[in-house]
């Protein structure tokens, strides 16, 4: 199976469009890409890079370097690299929702997304907290954020919260949903028959038997015991300061961190260029780059396409595996 994937560049004034141009310089055998984007922005990116780009109709086939099928989502005003315009917020959101709807309808099999500038979207009058939340709301599901590179996968029990709010946000129902979502995704999309998940403690030393916090004793341990009784292979709660040692990581398929900066610094240190962001729990695979819009680099031809390349390759793999698991 050769999955059909939506490719969404993200912020038109950032590096997303030029990364898409670089991506299609090698024809892909693992998937067919359909860009949801402003055609003029893609052409400008190709010109800035001095690379070939042939925008094709949706029913065409990409055969040579630079071929890219496009479903046009025009900007409201012309975009200029390095200068994000809130007037184009509607086009950015429209491209994301269009890609999501194409997957929900069964037309496409997955979505690969470039970086979006949250502040610019909100300045454009659209309440927006992130693409993860946008696509989850569209699909009517609760999702889990996972980041991954070639060394480790890290799922998050909470995402973008102030540290003072994290403990209150971790509840037994919420943590159970997260673990079930991660477990199901590892089976369905990664093809792991019996995934092993390491669960980090919230507190230093995983609470030190209640002396450094009781969340582990009162909430995490009882939940893990109950889910283990159902057959889930869960290890923990583990002290976060030693859980990422290579010898320990080798025994886990995924690590569940309780908050953003507990799990992600190690992942990004171990391979930021190859890191990608996955949304687990959607009816289709969505994989995003793990970097921002980099307005200061846009149009200069120096942005690294590694994360977008990794995201596209992984999304194609997940889409194929999901079909096999159906």
UniProtKB/Swiss-Prot annotation:
Keywords, sorted A to Z: Cobalt, Cytoplasm, Magnesium, Metal-binding, NAD, NADP, Oxidoreductase, Pyridoxine biosynthesis, Zinc
Major localization class: cytoplasm
Molecular function terms, GO-annotated: 4-hydroxythreonine-4-phosphate dehydrogenase activity; cobalt ion binding; magnesium ion binding; NAD binding; zinc ion binding
Catalytic activity: 4-(phosphooxy)-L-threonine + NAD(+) = 3-amino-2-oxopropyl phosphate + CO2 + NADH
SUPFAM superfamilies referenced in this protein's UniProt entry, alphabetically: Isocitrate/Isopropylmalate dehydrogenase-like
Cofactor note: Binds 1 divalent metal cation per subunit. Can use ions such as Zn(2+), Mg(2+) or Co(2+).
Cofactor: Zn(2+); Mg(2+); Co(2+)
Cellular component GO terms, alphabetical: cytoplasm
Binding site for substrate: 132, 268, 277, 286
Pathway linked to the protein: Cofactor biosynthesis; pyridoxine 5'-phosphate biosynthesis; pyridoxine 5'-phosphate from D-erythrose 4-phosphate: step 4/5
The keyword Oxidoreductase appears for this protein: yes
Miscellaneous note of the record: The active site is located at the dimer interface.
Oligomeric form and interacting partners: Homodimer.
Protein's name according to its UniProt entry: 4-hydroxythreonine-4-phosphate dehydrogenase
Source organism (scientific name): Stenotrophomonas maltophilia (strain R551-3)
Gene name in the database record: pdxA
